[in-house]
């Protein structure tokens, strides 16, 4: 019944198995990939006919994590998986990026990749396995895919690269880098690093490329057994049409792409396109060509003219040379009520970035396959349509916004202070108000400034820059701080973020083969120069974190109590802690290890809450003096509440100096008094005294008398001799 085929290799000290022919047999391509005990199913289905009216590759990728893979049941009322989590969205993009450029030009058939995590062993992250399984399924499917690709995760522990580090090793690694590509070329890099230098980062990329070669060979071996015949793609030779259109509008396009202002340039390009359309589609005549075809050739000519100009003249669309960064204006404190804010403008790209400080109550609970954890740093990126002068639908967060936000998050995460030193939940929001290239890197720069404006003690300011590449044969140009058009029409999108000490994040997407290690080295070196320049411009606004938090930010004090006292502080059903919060106005959060965080924008509220909690969680000191309140008057003395919920007895003989006939002659219920803790009787009852304490000043009269006696004795000693 089943026609199974499989291959198995040892990869990074663990078995990797790829199997097809048993599960999901009606899909065009289906592969079950197993690494350790992590298992994923990747399926590919491509429509039989091209989608009408599109000039792009209609590819969708969905990565899905099933909670049963980790032996868990989903939370919530419905107890089933809901909308995609942030990780599912990010991994879907991670898979999409290296496979998209490998489809044959002209493929317009709807193509869907679905990757399902079936088992997770809590050691091997499914994302790398998902990439490998997708590559294998595409290679088997018959879709015109110029693969296969391999992928690997690279760590850096104790100055050594580590292939596919397990989850426990990820805690100590200085690098989390994912690299994907073909046997000959790197296509995609995604990483977070702890301020590593360019040589280490490039070495990690090449290390990963070398070590996923066995995976590429394993997929080829599986394809030799089970691959379907590749589908034909009809490719039309447009050289004659290209030459014809070029003669019609070459000068118009060259002039348009010499206009530095984006909106004016787009208007000029639009006129050139209208000229072409009017030529090929005159009113009242039957057209010879499809409009989509003419538009596609026009778009191709746009790319060629921009690329020729850059390589021939060394000048870019806006007149810059290849290394110049656009003009930068950085401002901080631009919003009066925000805890921290910055406006970062670089050419026609602008980000308004706002930082908000929160407490433990604001932490985000993340429910992942490896367990539930709390995230204390959030970075959200918003890209409204007005930022590019367009109208558009407003609604849920798009995949691109999630991806760009995570890239900026990775850039800043390594420079944040440890949570135990700065116990705030941090939310950074980047509102892109203008965009013409590299808005994610503008978000990094603006976020760094906004965090410092809020008083967050970053290790060092962080900046980001987007690099591009034009490659034609032996000639190439690496471009610093690319425009949107240079991104779309170039061969590489290369984003680097970091401090003056090193790289914190690197993202690379390469659209063509043939980019060598040497070219990547040049790009990294040029990116470093640009990054240092941008940091210098940012320093004109702010060089370090502000010494004080913003006026409207909460203050948090942290201290510890014994774990066996947590129950007393919380009280039955939370009664005690609710009373503390209600009466002091402070927010209180208690961790399982006894760490207490007290937060309020009012310092007095914090002091009151801390005093209250400490009085419950600690024991009173012998011979210490406390403020107290008389809670009950008896014939033999008065009971005084003096230490949180603790009461003690002031015996009638300890009420005042001299003989006291009746307790009520000295105190009554509700009186505020000062008492000294004398000790505990045989039954553990607390003994207090009022007569040895000055009720006005709180001074210890016993200690005072003893000190005076010792002084008199010392002064009288010489006379006695």
From Swiss-Prot:
Belongs to the polyribonucleotide nucleotidyltransferase family. It is found in: Cytoplasm. Residues 623-691 form the S1 motif domain. Its EC number is 2.7.7.8. One of its GO terms (cellular component) is cytosol. Involved in mRNA degradation. Catalyzes the phosphorolysis of single-stranded polyribonucleotides processively in the 3'- to 5'-direction. Mg(2+) binds at residues 487, 493. This is Polyribonucleotide nucleotidyltransferase. GO terms for biological process: mRNA catabolic process; RNA processing. Gene3D superfamilies: GHMP Kinase, N-terminal domain, K Homology domain, type 1, Nucleic acid-binding proteins. GO terms for molecular function: 3'-5'-RNA exonuclease activity; magnesium ion binding; polyribonucleotide nucleotidyltransferase activity; RNA binding. Residues 697-721 are annotated as: Disordered. InterPro entries: ExoRNase_PH_dom1 (IPR001247), ExoRNase_PH_dom2 (IPR015847), ExoRNase_PH_dom2_sf (IPR036345), KH_dom (IPR004087), KH_dom_type_1 (IPR004088), KH_dom_type_1_sf (IPR036612), NA-bd_OB-fold (IPR012340), PNPase (IPR012162). HAMAP family: PNPase. Residues 701-714 have a biased composition (Basic and acidic residues). It catalyses: RNA(n+1) + phosphate = RNA(n) + a ribonucleoside 5'-diphosphate. Residues 554-613 form the KH domain. Coiled coil: none annotated.
């Amino acid at each position: 019944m089943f026609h199974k085929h499989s291959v198995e290799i040892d990869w990074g000290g663990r078995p990797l198995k790829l199997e097809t022919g048993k599960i999901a047999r009606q899909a065009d391509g289906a592969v079950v990939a197993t690494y350790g005990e992590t298992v994923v199913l990747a399926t590919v289905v491509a429509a039989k006919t091209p989608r009408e009216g599109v000039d792009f590759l209609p590819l969708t990728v969905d990565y899905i994590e099933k909670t049963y893979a980790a032996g868990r049941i989903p939370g919530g009322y419905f107890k089933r998986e809901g909308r995609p989590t942030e990780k599912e969205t990010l991994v879907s993009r991670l898979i999409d990026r290296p496979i998209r450029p490998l489809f044959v030009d002209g493929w317009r058939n709807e193509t869907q990749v679905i990757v399902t995590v079936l088992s997770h062993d809590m050691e091997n992250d499914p994302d790398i396995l998902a990439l490998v399984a997708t590559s294998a399924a595409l290679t088997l499917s018959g879709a015109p895919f110029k693969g296969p690709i391999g992928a690997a995760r690279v760590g850096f522990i104790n100055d050594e690269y580590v292939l596919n580090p397990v989850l426990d090793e990820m805690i100590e690694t200085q690098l989390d880098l994912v690299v994907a590509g073909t046997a000959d070329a790197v296509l995609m890099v995604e990483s977070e690093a702890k301020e590593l230098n360019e040589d280490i980062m490039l070495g990690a990329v090449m290390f990963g490329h070398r070590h996923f070669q066995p995976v590429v060979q394993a997929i080829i071996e599986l394809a030799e057994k089970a691959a379907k015949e590749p589908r034909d793609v009809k490719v039309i030779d447009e050289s004659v049409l290209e030459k014809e259109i070029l003669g019609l509008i070459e000068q118009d396009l060259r002039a348009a792409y010499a206009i530095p202002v984006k909106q004016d340039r787009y208007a000029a390009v639009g006129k050139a396109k209208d000229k072409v359309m009017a030529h090929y589609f005159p009113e009242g005549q039957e057209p010879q060509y499809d409009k989509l075809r003419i538009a596609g050739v026009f778009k191709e000519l746009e790319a060629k003219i921009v690329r020729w100009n850059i390589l021939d003249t060394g000048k870019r669309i806006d007149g810059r040379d290849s290394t110049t960064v656009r003009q930068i204006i950085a401002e901080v404190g631009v919003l009066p009520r925000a805890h921290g804010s910055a406006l970062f403008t670089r050419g026609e790209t602008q980000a308004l970035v706002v930082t908000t400080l929160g407490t433990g109550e604001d932490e985000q609970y993340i429910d992942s396959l490896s367990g539930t954890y709390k995230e204390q740093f959030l970075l959200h990126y918003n890209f409204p349509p007005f930022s590019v002068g367009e109208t558009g639908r407003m609604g849920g967060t798009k995949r691109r916004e999630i991806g760009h936000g995570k890239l900026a998050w990775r850039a800043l995460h390594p420079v944040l202070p440890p949570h135990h030193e700065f116990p705030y939940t941090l939310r950074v929001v980047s509102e892109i108000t203008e965009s013409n290239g590299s808005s994610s890197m503008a978000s990094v720069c603006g976020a760094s400034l906004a965090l410092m404006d809020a008083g967050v003690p970053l290790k060092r300011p962080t900046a980001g820059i987007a690099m591009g590449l034009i490659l034609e044969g032996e000639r190439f140009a690496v471009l610093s701080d690319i425009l949107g058009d240079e991104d779309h029409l170039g061969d590489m999108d290369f984003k680097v973020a970091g401090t003056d000490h090193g790289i914190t994040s690197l993202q690379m997407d390469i659209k063509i083969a043939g980019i060598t290690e040497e070219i990547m080295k040049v790009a990294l070196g040029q990116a470093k120069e640009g990054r240092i320049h941008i940091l210098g411009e940012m320093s004109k606004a702010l060089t370090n974190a502000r010494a004080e938090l913003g006026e409207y930010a909460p203050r948090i004090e942290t201290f510890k109590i014994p774990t066996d006292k947590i129950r007393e502080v919380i009280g039955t059903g939370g009664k005690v802690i609710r009373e503390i919060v209600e009466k002091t106005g402070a927010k209180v959060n208690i961790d399982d290890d006894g760490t207490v965080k007290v937060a309020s924008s009012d310092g007095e509220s914090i002091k009151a809450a801390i005093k209250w909690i400490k009085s419950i969680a600690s024991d009173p000191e012998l011979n210490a003096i406390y403020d107290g309140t008389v809670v009950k008057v008896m014939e033999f003395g008065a009971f005084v509440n003096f230490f949180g919920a603790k009461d003690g007895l002031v015996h009638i003989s300890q009420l005042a100096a001299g003989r006291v006939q009746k307790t009520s002659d000295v105190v009554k219920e509700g009186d505020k008094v000062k008492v000294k803790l004398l000790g505990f009787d045989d039954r553990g009852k607390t003994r207090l005294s009022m007569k040895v304490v000055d009720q006005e000043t709180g001074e210890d009269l016993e200690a005072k008398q003893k000190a005076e006696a010792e002084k008199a004795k010392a002064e009288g000693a010489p006379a006695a001799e």
